[in-house]
Structures are given as C-alpha cells and as structure tokens.
C-alpha cells in the first residue's frame, strides 16, 4: 500500500503502478480455479486495455474483440494477440466459439448490448454502472434467467478478496454489530469541457453512476439488508447531471450509511465501517487489498492484506467463470448490484437527473 502521506494516484496511474508491481511475479494459482471460458470484449477503451493487460499477467488472452470503429478493434487485437476481430457485434454474438462477453462501452449503451448478448446465450460481465436504472437491470436479469446464462456486474468491490474476507469475519461475529458505514469519494474533473463523459448527459455522465456506485456497493456489502430510508441532497450542473451529493441511508436493522460524492474536488477514497468491537478503515477502496482494523477494547491496529490490487479485473472474470461452474455465492453478487442500482435510481430521481433514454 502506498504511504498514506502521499497524494493518491489517479485511477489510470494507480492501475499502471499496480501492474508494474507484479510484472515479474508468478501469477497466483488460486484465482482462476474454474473451467476457462472463451471471452470476447466489446469496446477498446481504457478498461478494456486494463483487462487485456490483467489477463496477460495470468498467461491468458481474450479470444475476440468488437468495437464501433473496426480499425480500433484491429489495432487492439494486434496489440494483445487476439485471434478474432468482428466487423459487427452481431458477428460476435453469432460465434459459437465465444462463451462469454465483457462489455466496456459507455453506461447508456450497456442495455442494448446486454439484451443481445444474453439472448444469444452468452454469459456477460458488464462494466459499471451495469445499466442506467433498475428497470433496465431487471430486464437484463430476466433475459439472463430465460436463457440460463450468467450476468455479472463488474464493479470491482464486489469481487476483491479483501471484502470477501472482511465479510466472512463479520458474518462469523468477529466484529460485533455493524452500526455505521461512512464513505467518501471525490474525483476532480475539470469543468471546462461539458462534452466529456463526466458531464455529458447523452453519455450518462454524473457522479452517481461513475463513482457513487463504488461507495454504495461497499456500504451495501456490510449492511444486513437494503436501506429502506434514504435522504439526500444533490447538486447538478448546467448539463443536468449530478456533480456532488450527500446521502444518508438506514435499514430495518437501524444500520446507517453516510456517503459523500463529488466531481469538483479531490477527496480520499476512504471507507470506515464501524462495529461494536472495532472499526475497519479501507483507503483507495475500489480495488483495495489492505484494510486496518482498530479494536475498541485496546486500540490495537490489525493490518489485513488479502488479494492484490493488480489482479482486480482478473477477480471479476474468475468470479463469472466460477458462477458458470455452479458457485451460487458468485451468482448472488448480482443481488447486491441490483440493490445498489435501486438506490442510485431513487437518488437520481430525487435530484432530477434524467437521461435521454429515460425520457
């Protein structure tokens, strides 16, 4: 973990540093444990490149790629040694040699690809935010069930081993009762160009779908049930998307969640989960592999290291392969994603944030 006194890296720089830290290390043999599927990716942006680089660490490759611009798909395939380049996504869906599809396109395009890929019998791992709203996600889940395929949300916190280990200990009663989850996420995005994806309503911009999904996912993972009460204040910009928000949630067990988000200021990506017996602090939580537990009785600090940041995207892909192989605990992750989407849909409605596809 980086020195806490240093300024945190932006996400791209952090990913690059993480990859460099494991470049010469053997890949763990406990990540990909289910039968290997043949994967194709839709989209050739930053996250698709990170996935290809992650797989290379494991000695694996994507089997195919499709992109709106064919030349970009061809260049991507050449860079990563991918065998198949599809002229259209329909060609990808029709290929019987592809088992699973990874969708990395802008948020507002996801449902179109989800409908077609799932109906074609492909398992799907879809980047966050998995859909624009709960109605779209419910539709995608129905299609997946009808065609007996796995749909999985690629929000990293749902798949990082650190959270699985902390939840295991929480469920075992090690920490006592969970009382309060506090999460911050501030990402400074220059406000001058309102056509960029962060502020562009036509690209489903805004803080909620881009960064809020991480904070709400961590919150929901540690709460015993979905919050029934949600109060908030949100700020929007002239394009109509949300740029900041303060959120307080409470569930039937009287557990509280407090979340702050902003695209106008840098904040630490910091989560503090407070229990009777301790509190757990996780910094840079979207791909975290380290947590500090501070015990109430004596102030002792326990350092927990589980998983590796550089393998974040491998954990996502491995979880889908495990779900396909019959691991119900991995299939259940979509339930948390659905709860988070329900919260985000309500919050955007409260703030008056409506995308063109929803009008």
Predicted regions span which residues?
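N-terminal Rossmann-like dinucleotide-binding module
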Residues: 2-80
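Short, conserved SAM-binding/catalytic segment
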Residues: 75-82, 140-146
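Beta-strand-loop-alpha-helix segment that lines the small-molecule cofactor/substrate pocket
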Residues: 100, 106-107, 111-158
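Predominantly a Rossmann-like dinucleotide-binding segment in NAD(P)-dependent oxidoreductases
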Residues: 157-230, 238
């Amino acid at each position: 973990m980086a020195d806490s006194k240093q300024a945190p890296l932006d996400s791209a720089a952090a990913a690059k540093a993480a990859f460099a830290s494991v470049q010469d290390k053997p890949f763990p043999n406990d990540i990909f444990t289910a039968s290997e599927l043949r994967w194709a990716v839709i989209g050739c942006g930053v996250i698709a490149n990170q996935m290809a680089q992650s797989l290379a660490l494991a000695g694996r490759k994507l089997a195919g790629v499709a992109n709106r611009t064919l030349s970009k798909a061809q260049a991507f395939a050449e860079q990563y040694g991918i065998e198949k380049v599809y002229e259209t996504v329909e060609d990808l869906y029709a290929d019987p040699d592809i088992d699973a599809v990874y969708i990395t396109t802008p948020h507002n395009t996801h449902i179109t690809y989800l409908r077609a890929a799932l109906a074609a019998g492909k398992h799907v791992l879809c980047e966050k935010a998995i859909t624009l709203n709960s109605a779209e996600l419910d539709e995608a889940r129905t299609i997946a069930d009808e065609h007996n395929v796995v749909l999985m949300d690629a929000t990293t916190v749902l798949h990082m081993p650190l959270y699985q280990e902390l939840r295991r200990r929480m469920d075992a009663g090690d920490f006592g009762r969970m009382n309060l989850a506090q999460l911050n996420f501030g990402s400074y995005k220059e406000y001058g160009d309102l056509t960029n994806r962060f502020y562009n309503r036509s690209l489903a911009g805004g803080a909620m779908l881009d960064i809020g999904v991480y904070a709400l996912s961590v919150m929901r993972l540690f709460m015993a049930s979905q919050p029934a009460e949600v109060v908030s204040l949100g700020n929007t910009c002239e394009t109509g998307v949300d740029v900041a928000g303060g959120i307080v949630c409470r569930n039937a067990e009287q557990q509280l969640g407090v979340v702050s988000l902003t695209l106008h200021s840098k904040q630490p990506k910091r989560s503090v989960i407070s229990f009777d017996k301790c509190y757990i602090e996780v910094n840079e939580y979207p791909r975290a592999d380290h947590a500090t537990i501070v015990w109430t009785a004596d102030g002792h600090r326990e350092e927990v290291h589980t998983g590796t940041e550089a393998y974040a995207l491998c954990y996502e892909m491995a979880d889908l392969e495990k779900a396909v192989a019959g691991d119900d605990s991995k299939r259940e992750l979509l339930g948390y994603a659905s709860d988070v989407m329900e919260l985000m849909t309500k919050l955007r409605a409260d703030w008056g944030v409506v995308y063109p596809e929803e009008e």
